[in-house]
Amino acid sequence: MLRYPADVSPFMAVPADPTPQDWANALSLIGAGHAIVFAPSPLTPSIPAVSQGLGLVQMVARDVTGALDPEVEQLTYADVPEILALTALTKPGPFLDRTIELGNYYGLRSDGHLVAMAGERMRAPGWTEISAICTAPEHRGKGLSVRLIRTLVHHINDRGEQVFLHAVESNPAIGLYESLGFEVRRRLVGTSLSAPT
């Protein structure tokens, strides 16, 4: 049973075929908060306070061209308040106070304000996930996300790693990702676990 620190990410890993004791251990790790577990099919935890059914696709970059962009800046801890405001507005997925510690995050600004961002989240040997791809509503349709994705692909590929991402099945950005050269690798289901109140 593994999970990220609660202020970094809500994600948790459980064994492929969890036992009741595994679920009890999961609850003890969750504490008073919540966690999200991803699996190829819905899980049926033997614990209370479970929310099922977040369908996701996992996509891999099969033929995505990376490129550096002189206007894209690397974000730092000093940018976290702006990052949290942008992610609260756009809801690209969980972004918490310390999520920036998971990898490199990049942004684009307009009149000094952060208006688009994306970064690195989960890692597996030879692979890095692109996450938190978001653009403020008034700046959508300008290709900002594409520029950020290409920047991340460049940096990740430059390290000799492959790129993947996750998206909610209903996310219209999936079409954009496919147009850039991403392919659906598999479907997943997210299960949210909360400690009983």
Language-model features and meaning:
Residues 62-93:
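Short amphipathic alpha-helix that is part of the acyltransferase structural core
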Residues 108-109, 121, 142-155, 162, ...:
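Recognition helices and adjacent regulatory flanks at domain boundaries
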Residues 38-42, 155, 164-175, 190-197:
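Conserved beta-strand-loop-alpha-helix junction that forms the acyl-donor binding cleft
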Residues 20-25, 135, 141-158, 174-179:
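Conserved acetyl-CoA-binding loop-helix of GNAT-fold acetyltransferases
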Residues 51-61, 183-197:
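Conserved catalytic-core motifs of GNAT/GCN5-like acyltransferases
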Residues 94-104, 108-137:
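A conserved beta-strand-loop-helix scaffold within acyl/acetyltransferase catalytic domains
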Residues 1-68:
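Acyl-donor-binding surface of acyltransferase catalytic domains
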Residues 43-48, 146, 169-186:
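Conserved active-site alpha-helix within GNAT-family acetyltransferase domains
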